């Protein structure tokens, strides 16, 4: 049984960890922290978890307690894992971080986008980027895993087959992405209020979103060269979901793109390449650790359109983190993650 600690248990990704791990036969949550809710029973904050965590309460983060865990998940804002990851690694505890703290390889690039110096640059070289469909072998040997962001997960999985095969003009890639409001977190903010988001949709951060350098870094690895990427995120009136509409120009029209995508993801348990002509819906992946993809070539031209959908809290966050944990500890990758999406 893998002993699990969670730092930052009161946000949406924290409670999603609890939901997923409640169904995991080989993992037990033994510590969950929250400075603001210390002493409060988990089941009192989250009634949906009654009967699953009745003996578990939030506590103040303590290195000695967390260091007794086999793995600690960080479901925290950026900067928190910087301060604690080194001590936990020294104690022999594995660290899986959902924040952006260890996703970028360049400390200066991180500081540019997050507005503060990187707090643990000595750990960047060791950190493994936790996209299993790319780095599964490295994840098996990792001590520190940086779980990809939600937009980067949907976007990279959609573009990867084209870039790995050298079929796309990488100088002009476009990612037009839509997100549900849970991606903004649980904190109170005017832009996330029901009356602000309901019956409306808007683009934001067009000049540059923090996920842009992460996406470019992953696509550059896949292509083996620098890429030109325009990334435009949008906020939509739904709670969960990412829908990425991706555009690329192909350099060889003779390739069967449907077969290319099906072959690339044939052995990936959490990527579903839909039949030709399909249009994946975000509701089809709600609550599931699945990226559902469809590839199109309108009018048989040289423009490829890839549609990629995920649940931002599952394959875009906590589910992907549990997938990484399963790989890291030599478990069946699908443990605790095999449930289907919820409909309607």
Curated annotation (Swiss-Prot):
Catalytic activity as recorded in UniProt: N-acetyl-L-glutamate 5-semialdehyde + phosphate + NADP(+) = N-acetyl-L-glutamyl 5-phosphate + NADPH + H(+)
Keywords attached to this entry: Amino-acid biosynthesis, Arginine biosynthesis, Cytoplasm, NADP, Oxidoreductase
Listed pathway(s): Amino-acid biosynthesis; L-arginine biosynthesis; N(2)-acetyl-L-ornithine from L-glutamate: step 3/4
SUPFAM superfamilies registered for this protein in UniProt: Glyceraldehyde-3-phosphate dehydrogenase-like, C-terminal domain, NAD(P)-binding Rossmann-fold domains
UniProt-annotated location(s): Cytoplasm
Listed EC numbers: 1.2.1.38
Upper classification of the organism: Bacteria, Pseudomonadati, Pseudomonadota, Gammaproteobacteria, Pseudomonadales
UniProt signal peptide: none
Domain of life: Bacteria
Protein name (database record): N-acetyl-gamma-glutamyl-phosphate reductase
Function description: Catalyzes the NADPH-dependent reduction of N-acetyl-5-glutamyl phosphate to yield N-acetyl-L-glutamate 5-semialdehyde.
Active-site residue numbers: 150
Keyword NADP (UniProt): yes
Organism annotation: Pseudomonas fluorescens (strain SBW25)
PANTHER family in alphabetical order: N-ACETYL-GAMMA-GLUTAMYL-PHOSPHATE REDUCTASE, CHLOROPLASTIC-RELATED (PTHR32338:SF10), N-ACETYL-GAMMA-GLUTAMYL-PHOSPHATE REDUCTASE, CHLOROPLASTIC-RELATED-RELATED (PTHR32338)
GO biological process: L-arginine biosynthetic process
GO molecular function list: N-acetyl-gamma-glutamyl-phosphate reductase activity; NAD binding; NADP+ binding
Protein family: Belongs to the NAGSA dehydrogenase family. Type 1 subfamily.
A GO term from the CC aspect: cytoplasm
Enzyme class: oxidoreductase
């Amino acid at each position: 049984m893998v002993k699990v600690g969670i730092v930052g248990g009161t946000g949406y990704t924290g409670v999603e960890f609890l939901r997923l791990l409640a169904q995991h036969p080989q993992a037990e949550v033994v510590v969950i922290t929250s400075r603001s809710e210390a002493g409060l029973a988990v089941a009192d904050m989250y009634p949906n978890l009654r009967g699953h965590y009745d003996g578990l309460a939030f506590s103040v983060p303590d290195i000695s307690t967390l260091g007794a865990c086999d793995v600690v998940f960080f479901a925290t804002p950026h900067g928190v894992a910087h301060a604690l990851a080194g001590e936990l690694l020294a104690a022999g505890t594995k660290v899986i971080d959902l924040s952006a703290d260890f996703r970028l390889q360049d400390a200066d690039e991180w500081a540019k986008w997050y507005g503060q110096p990187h707090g643990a640059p000595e750990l960047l070289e060791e950190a493994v980027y936790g996209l299993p469909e790319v780095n599964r072998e490295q994840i098996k040997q990792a001590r520190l895993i940086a779980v990809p962001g939600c937009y980067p997960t949907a976007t990279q999985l959609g573009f990867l087959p084209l870039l790995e095969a050298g079929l796309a003009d990488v100088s002009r890639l476009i990612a037009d992405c839509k997100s549900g409001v849970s991606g903004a977190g649980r904190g109170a903010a005017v832009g996330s209020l029901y009356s602000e988001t309901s019956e409306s949709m808007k683009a934001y951060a067009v000049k540059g979103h923090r996920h842009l350098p992460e996406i470019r870094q992953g696509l550059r690895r896949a292509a083996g060269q620098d890429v030109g990427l325009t990334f435009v995120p949008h906020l939509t009136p739904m709670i969960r979901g990412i829908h990425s509409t991706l555009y690329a120009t192909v350099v060889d029209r003779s390739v069967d793109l449907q077969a290319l995508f099906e072959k690339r993801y044939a052995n990936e348990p959490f990527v579903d390449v839909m039949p030709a002509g399909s249009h994946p819906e975000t509701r089809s992946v709600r609550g599931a650790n699945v990226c559902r993809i469809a590839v199109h070539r309108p009018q048989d031209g040289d423009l490829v359109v890839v549609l990629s959908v995920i649940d931002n809290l599952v394959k875009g966050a906590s589910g992907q983190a549990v997938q990484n944990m399963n790989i890291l500890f030599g478990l069946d990758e699908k443990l605790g993650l095999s449930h289907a999406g919820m409909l309607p």
